[in-house]
Amino acid sequence: MDKKTKKHRSLYIPYAGPVLLEFPLLNKGSAFSAEERSSFNLLGLLPEVVETIEEQAERAWIQYQGFKTEIDKHIYLRNIQDTNETLFYRLVQNHLEEMMPVIYTPTVGAACERFSEIYRRSRGVFISYENRHNMDDILQNVPNHNIKVIVVTDGERILGLGDQGIGGMGIPIGKLSLYTACGGISPAYTLPVVLDVGTNNQQLLTDPLYMGWRHPRVTDDEYYQFVDDFIQAVKHRWPDVLLQFEDFAQKNAMPLLNRYRDEICSFNDDIQGTAAVTAGTLIAASRAAGSQLSYQKIVFLGAGSAGCGIAEQIIAQTQREGLSEELARSRVFMVDRFGLLTDAMPNLLPFQTKLVQKRENLKNWDTDNEVLSLLDVVRNVKPDILIGVSGQTGLFTEEIIREMHKHCERPIVMPLSNPTSRVEATPQDIIVWTEGNALVATGSPFDPVIWKDKVYPIAQCNNSYIFPGIGLGVIASGASRITDEMLMSASETLAQHSPLVKNGEGLVLPELKDIHIVSRAIAFAVGKMAQQQGVAVKTSADALQQAIDENFWMPEYRSYRRTSI
């Protein structure tokens, strides 16, 4: 069946009347045709006029503009999503640049903090530790049989906001909204999940409105057994699903990824997605400057799982460009709250050990400090690139940025911490402190900076450039695993779509209006690499492209015909 026929054929629906209107995936509201209203017992349940989806979207846009705060806009959009998903995605598609920061970062942070307060209607699956023995039954309660993408969190490290308990559910919901809005994955194929293992947030534990399990967090063997029970139940119900780990605490994120990435098709977006989009941004920025990433010296502030994941991706890329592993690692410097990571530092985490600098190689540094601060590192390394993943605001001080600029004419500065309140430095300050010479990319959206009558666009190094395309590529190719090479192919493809690289001007990352083009291209690259790696069945390029096209969902109403259950 060709793509056009498949996407325009009628759907046979067993629901009718108010039940149909309460089904978000199927509800059309005022767009039900006269024939459908008669067939599905909807006569008199809707206003007389039959509207198009564009007319509905225009009304929703007018209503949206009436809300003054970002959190109220978020609540409004979530209400549409929970009543008419097709309309929700048409509205978001029409206003993606305006609405992406509202449905996801930074506004989703406030929505997570206030989750129990603003709760309206259930979405997704809440699995509490108290119900751990009912795991299979819980997943059987999900009405969608063909789930292809799950985003799961335990709510312990939500953005830079810490432990939000079940309030962390806002992240999987928002993330999956972007899988659909940016990557064309049908909402019928997606499932947000929160693992409710308690919370150590005392404010939540004493909040009478808090809807989660009121208990300190389960840890150690009990925690890992609970997660394993969930993974096994998922494999039993949906063996081919793509599982994305989201906002797990540092102590659990990497162990869970390493444990399950070869058991189920899975990845951690905080570690691997952030690494892929950052690497793609840096590849593009280096090429735009007529250079290569392998020529750059890079300093990180933040040596957690996300920062180390980015560093490892960069090291892999520079090895592809010709560096030895030893030389590649010698050009990357990791700084955390205890200073520069060195081989003399005790109590390093396993994923940090390969990213240390040899203390012996630092003996000629211009400093008497035993603990080497970020300023010490910048002064002695003279980096070309400074990346912030600390989750702490204001740590890129004027002194540090000006010191960097002394030795680098066009510094690349990337304060990536989310949400906006946690950013290491604002783009405005960085532009001023570098006399307009810095290339700035941030984790959260920022308006362009105007300095000395010149406009400086600020690229958002947003994972949504990467993970929707990866998801689409996995679904289209039928990949059983996500390999490092698949992630690197996504980074390379993103860099190839940089306006700054292609045109010599503009943003280092594509505009959001081109996100579907980018996601399709990444999906093809990821699917092709999956085939080369032997984790997907080999097909022709044309067949892979056809599979991508067939799986790319657009927010358009289908005609309905009634059938019995």
Curated annotation (Swiss-Prot):
InterPro entries: Aminoacid_DH-like_N_sf (IPR046346), Malic_enzyme_CS (IPR015884), Malic_N_dom (IPR012301), Malic_N_dom_sf (IPR037062), Malic_NAD-bd (IPR012302), Malic_OxRdtase (IPR001891), NAD(P)-bd_dom_sf (IPR036291), NAD_malic_enz_proteobac (IPR023667). The active site is at Y104, K175. A divalent metal cation binds at E246, D247, D270. Keywords: Metal-binding, NAD, Oxidoreductase. Gene3D superfamilies: Malic enzyme, N-terminal domain, NAD(P)-binding Rossmann-like Domain. It is an enzyme of class 1 (oxidoreductase). Belongs to the malic enzymes family. This is NAD-dependent malic enzyme. It comes from Enterobacter sp. (strain 638). The gene is maeA.
